[in-house]
Design a protein with these regions (language model features):
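Catalytic strand-loop segment that frames the active site of acyl-thioester-processing enzymes
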Residues: 1, 88-148
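Hydrophobic, proline/glycine-rich low-complexity stretches
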Residues: 1-4, 12, 155
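Hydrophobic residues on conserved beta-strands that form the core of alpha/beta folds
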Residues: 6-8, 38-39, 54, 110, ...
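Short structured motifs
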Residues: 6-14, 25-26, 38, 163-170, ...
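HotDog/MaoC-like acyl-thioester-processing domains
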Residues: 13, 17-22, 28-99, 173-175, ...
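Structured core of small recognition/catalytic domains
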Residues: 121-200, 207
Length: 243
């Protein structure tokens, strides 16, 4: 048995993935040092022949020499893939310059949850799916607060799309823990938005995870991003860090 824990992950979304698309995930070991494994991976759309997403994941695990060799060999196999683009060195930099772990006391409360039995992973802790589910709910509440609510989206056929994200996991969330998501914008561009969520233990105030996301509002008919509406920009500016 190998004990492991995901420490952080960066993702860049490159192309849309359509219903019934055939996908392949290709992994490559970037480094194995000091009980940390850094993996690069790509999600490849076989039918569209393009890369839909790029990931860089840091995992903490205890490896002896034999297991380290097995892991390295496993993730460097390339002869069975349908993807020809196996050169991972050409990715644009996965930078991680963002606000610190400490969350703003003036942040928008975007989600409140509790860890239930159906949220647990094999270690009986709140799973990554539970945490990312909090992120999805928080984004919906944040956009609703700024004016991009359900009715407005339906009337104008507007959606939203994440461009990339950076997540860091700090602590586990055991059964029964009540958590709150605190959210601030970190950048408001002409079309793009960047915001950060901090998932916090209601009892201790400890940060369980944080995630910064770059996203756009998306015209579903034209299939392209749109300029941030002025009303949205005004409300979002009130939540801008250091505003």
């Amino acid at each position: 048995k190998i004990n492991y824990k995901i420490l952080n992950e960066r993702c860049i979304f490159s192309r849309e993935v359509h219903l019934n698309s055939v996908l392949e995930i290709i992994f490559k070991v970037k480094s194995i040092n000091n009980d940390e494994l850094v993996l690069l991976s790509k999600v490849y759309s076989v039918d569209h022949e393009n890369v839909a997403a790029y990931f860089e994941t840091t995992i903490s695990l205890s490896l002896d020499e034999q297991i380290e060799k097995i892991v390295f060999n496993l993730f460097t196999l390339g002869d069975t893939t349908l993807l020809n683009e196996l050169d991972f060195s050409d990715l644009r930099p996965l930078t991680d310059n963002r606000p610190p772990k400490i969350y703003s006391r003036d942040a928008f409360i975007s989600c409140k949850k509790a860890v239930n039995t159906w949220d647990l992973n094999h270690d009986l802790m709140g799973s990554s799916r539970f945490k990312i589910g909090c992120v999805s709910d928080a984004a919906t509440h944040l956009f609703t607060y700024c004016g991009a609510d359900f009715n407005w989206r339906n009337e104008y056929d507007i959606g939203s799309a994440a461009l990339d994200y950076s997540v860091r996991y700090y602590k586990d969330a055991p059964l029964g823990m009540a958590v709150t998501m605190y959210t601030n914008f970190t950048k408001i561009g002409n079309k793009s938005l960047k915001f950060i969520h901090h998932l916090v233990d209601d009892n201790t105030g400890d940060v369980i995870m944080d995630i910064e996301i770059a996203a756009v509002l998306f015209d579903l008919q034209k299939r392209k991003s749109m300029v941030v509406p002025e009303e949205f920009r005004v409300k979002a500016s009130k939540l801008l860090i250091n505003n």
